[in-house]
From Swiss-Prot:
Official protein name in the record: Methylthioribulose-1-phosphate dehydratase
Organism: Klebsiella pneumoniae subsp. pneumoniae (strain ATCC 700721 / MGH 78578)
Gene: mtnB
Pfam families: Aldolase_II
Pathway the protein acts in: Amino-acid biosynthesis; L-methionine biosynthesis via salvage pathway; L-methionine from S-methyl-5-thio-alpha-D-ribose 1-phosphate: step 2/6
Enzyme type, top EC level: lyase
Length: 202
C-alpha cells in the first residue's frame, strides 16, 4: 500500500514543481510506511524531477535514516505530524509565495479564514460561514525546538489541515495522496484570496 502511495507522491511532487510551489529545490514531501517508518524526500532535490529513488526511509520516533543519506531539513516536522495524527499518511511541505507572504502579514499566531466557498475543499468543512483557523509558528532553524513548540500547541488547540511557518511556507497533510493534494490546493487558493482581500478592502 505505501509503495503505491509513494508512486503517487512522486507524481504529486512533479505537479507541485510545475506550479512553482517548491522552487530552487525547496520543500519536502513524505508518505507513511507504517507506525515506525516513513519515506521522505532527500535534501537538495528538485521536486519537479523526483523519482522514488530520491526518497529515504526515516524512523518516525528518531528522525534517523538508516541509509546514512541526508533527508530534508524539516524531517522533524514530518515525523511530528505522523506522531500527532495516526490517520495522516502523507505530508506536504511547500514554499509558496502566498503562504510565505501571508504568514508575515498576519501578526497573530492564527490565520482565520472565513467567508470563502472554497473552505469546503478542506475535510469536514461544510459552510463558508464557518471559521477555519490555520496556526502560524515563528520560523526556527532549530527544527527540534520548532517541533516541540508545535507539539505543545497541539495539546491545547486544534491543529487541522496544516500550519504556516512565518516567512517560510506551509505544511499540510492528509489520510491519502488525494486528500493531502486537495487540501494543499484548497489552502493555496484560500491564501491567495485572503492576500487579495487584504490588499483591496479598505
Amino acid at each position: 500500500m505505501w509503495q503505491e502511495r509513494l508512486a503517487q507522491l512522486v507524481t504529486t511532487c512533479h505537479w507541485i514543481g510545475a506550479k512553482g510551489w517548491a522552487p530552487a529545490t525547496g520543500g519536502n514531501m513524505s508518505v507513511r510506511q507504517d507506525d515506525t517508518w516513513c519515506w521522505l524526500s532527500e535534501s537538495g532535490r528538485d521536486k519537479g524531477s523526483l523519482t522514488t529513488e530520491d526518497f529515504l526511509q526515516v524512523e518516525i520516533a528518531t528522525n534517523q535514516a538508516p541509509s546514512g543519506r541526508k533527508p530534508s531539513a524539516e524531517t522533524g516536522l514530518h515525523t511530528l505530524v505522523y506522531r500527532l495524527f495516526p490517520e495522516a499518511n502523507v505530508v506536504l511541505h511547500v514554499h509558496t509565495v502566498n503562504a510565505t507572504v501571508l504568514s508575515r502579514i498576519e501578526k497573530s499566531d492564527t490565520l482565520a479564514l472565513q467567508g470563502y466557498e472554497m473552505q469546503k475543499t478542506l475535510s469536514g468543512q461544510h459552510s463558508h460561514l464557518d471559521t477555519v483557523p490555520i496556526a502560524i509558528f515563528d520560523n526556527d532553524q532549530d527544527i527540534d525546538a520548532l517541533a516541540a513548540r508545535i507539539a505543545d500547541y497541539a495539546q491545547t488547540r486544534p491543529l487541522r489541515y496544516g500550519f504556516l511557518l512565518r516567512g517560510h511556507g506551509l505544511t499540510c497533510w492528509g489520510k491519502d495522496i488525494q486528500e493531502a493534494r486537495r487540501q494543499l490546493e484548497g489552502l493555496e487558493f484560500l491564501f491567495e484570496c485572503e492576500l487579495m482581500r487584504r490588499r483591496y478592502e479598505p
